A protein has these predicted regions:
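Residue-level signature of outer-membrane beta-barrel architecture
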Residues: 9, 44-48, 81-84, 93, ...
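Repeated loop/turn-to-beta-strand initiation elements of outer-membrane beta-barrel proteins
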Residues: 9, 49-55, 86-89, 138-141, ...
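Membrane-embedded beta-strand positions of outer-membrane beta-barrel proteins
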Residues: 13-15, 55-59, 91, 132, ...
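Transmembrane beta-strand segments that form the barrel wall of outer-membrane beta-barrel proteins
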Residues: 15-25, 54-65, 76, 113, ...
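Residues that define the transmembrane beta-barrel architecture of outer-membrane proteins
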Residues: 32-38, 71-76, 124-128, 135, ...
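Outer membrane beta-barrel
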Residues: 45-161, 194, 360
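Outer-membrane beta-barrel "beta-signal"
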Residues: 132, 268, 357, 370-384
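Detector for outer-membrane/organellar transmembrane beta-barrel domains
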Residues: 244-328
Length: 384
């Protein structure tokens, strides 16, 4: 009978206070310009069976001053991992990231977006999953079984960055008769070939990106009900190193409700090392975004160009600044801009500044609902 000896449990995590200030008055009377929130994100890890098995946990809880829907908790990760010589199996709740580009992640489809967290869609909810990975000289292959679907979070009636009608998250609609219990599955192969990194993926299941149906809620008020269709998605992501150039590309072919369309994002990042004989590095970024759903009003990245720059200070505090603008090439008066800056104060404390500006005078564009939601956010983060 095998005996399992657990190593010590490692506890880490972070907590933060965030002050967000919107630069313009809100469109709707329930909304405020200033908003304070705090979050706590504990982590734990232990290994056993001579390091061949491990259990990891990542939790998250946020309290928001204004928006009840943004006050929420989630298990980002709680999984068991068993590692063999050339294979690995996992079961539980996990987070997986696919992709290479900066401005948009098209192939990243395993986890649902925690949309109340930030406008960039980088924050994800934990996804129940069982995975099996095979590691060979010809690449790494992983099969995913996803037995339960997570619905996307949305700001409530008191929150900013939301559509004109509130989203009725209590009454979602599904194409699958199994609703959130539909068994989704995915397959991914990735490999490094010299200076090239290539990933191929396939997903079959419930779309993480909902459509919306205008309806009435329990109070007989108009609302938007999320509708989650079944989709099939084939994806490719590529990164290539060419001297000071980094070429990035992501593309998908999707079938949704008997409609096929293509979307892709691609571009480059070029690095100037030691700017003007200093310790600073500056990177220039450009990416083009295309989506074949040209008549879909809820699609933002249809025919857009992102230009940006990243300034790396190369100091002991890891200071860096990323700034950029995304221009709609179909409408000259539709664009957005962003700034992300961060630096460590000491071994435990870090500050972060995030700012977003939205400009849209086209009512038919998805970004029109954000036209008064320019904001700046200051975060003070503690790591333990």
């Amino acid at each position: 009978m095998p005996t399992f000896v657990f190593a010590d449990i490692e506890y880490t995590g972070s907590a933060a206070v965030e002050q967000r200030y919107f630069l313009q008055d809100a469109l709707y009377p329930q909304q405020e310009r200033a908003n304070l929130s705090v979050y706590f994100a504990p982590q734990a890890y232990t290994s056993f069976n001579d390091g061949n098995d491990s259990i990891s946990f990542k939790g998250f809880y946020r309290f928001d001053q204004q928006d009840e829907e943004r006050t929420h908790g989630d298990i980002r990760e709680f999984k068991w991992t068993h590692s063999g010589e050339e294979w690995e199996a996992q079961a539980g709740i996990g987070k997986v990231f696919w992709g290479q580009t900066e401005s948009l992640h098209l192939v990243d489809i395993i986890n649902q977006t925690d949309a109340v967290e930030a406008i960039d869609g980088e924050d994800k909810l934990g996804q129940p999953m069982v995975t099996f990975s095979l590691f060979k000289d010809w690449g790494n292959t992983t099969v995913f079984a996803l037995p339960y679907f997570r619905e996307r979070t949305f700001s409530g009636i008191d929150g900013r960055i939301r559509p004109a009608l509130p989203v009725d998250t209590d009454n979602p609609l599904f194409e699958s008769e199994d609703e959130e219990k539909n068994l989704d599955w995915a397959l991914r192969w990735q490999h490094t070939l010299g200076d090239w990194e290539v990933g191929l993926s396939y997903f079959d299941g419930t779309s993480r990106e909902p459509d919306f149906v205008v309806a009435t809620n329990e109070s007989s008020e108009p609302s938007l009900r999320p509708f989650y269709p079944q989709i099939q998605q084939a994806g490719i992501d590529v990164l290539a190193l060419m001297g000071g150039w980094v070429i990035k590309f992501e593309g998908v072919q999707r079938k949704v409700m008997d409609e096929d369309y293509t979307a892709f994002v691609g571009g480059f990042e070029y690095s100037f090392v030691g700017l003007f004989d200093s310790v600073y590095d500056i990177n220039w970024l450009m990416e083009y975004q295309y989506d074949g759903r040209e008549n879909q009003s809820n699609v933002i990245a249809q025919n857009d160009l992102m230009l940006g720059t990243r300034l790396v200070f190369n100091d002991i505090d890891g200071t860096q600044i990323l700034a950029g603008v995304v221009q709609d090439l179909d409408h000259s008066n539709v664009r957005s801009g962003f700034i992300e800056a961060s630096s460590r104060i000491n071994n435990h404390w870090k500050w972060r500044v995030d700012a977003y500006i939205f400009s849209s005078d086209e009512p038919t564009e998805a970004s029109y609902m954000l036209r008064r939601d320019d904001y700046a956010q200051l975060s003070l983060e503690y790591y333990f």
